[in-house]
């Protein structure tokens, strides 16, 4: 239970950062954030970002990229298998 609370707090911070980035991106036409799910509607397609508390991961999927999984590397950062942090990765997609 404690790990799910930790995940919920960290993922909420990440989702808030992603929403803030989406609001600044000229590529993002619309976005929505609702209870562990962020939807980004970009010119290149829709992106769905979902927190998976039971796995301790955040999943990003779209037709443009397929799917990417981000996990807690040291209990503080969500990274993909290449070691790239999720917010940095999203910045590239949003061209910020």
Regions found by a protein language model. Give the residues of each.
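N-terminal intrinsically disordered, cationic/polar leader segments
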Residues: 1-96
């Amino acid at each position: 239970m404690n790990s799910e609370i930790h995940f919920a707090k960290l993922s909420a911070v990440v989702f808030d950062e992603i929403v803030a980035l989406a609001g600044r991106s000229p590529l993002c036409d619309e976005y929505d954030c609702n209870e562990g799910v962020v939807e980004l509607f970009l010119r290149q397609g829709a992106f769905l970002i979902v927190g998976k508390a039971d796995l301790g991961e955040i999943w990003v999927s779209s037709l443009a990229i397929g799917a990417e999984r981000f996990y807690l590397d040291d209990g503080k950062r969500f990274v993909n298998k290449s070691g790239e942090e999720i917010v940095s990765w999203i910045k590239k997609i949003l061209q910020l």
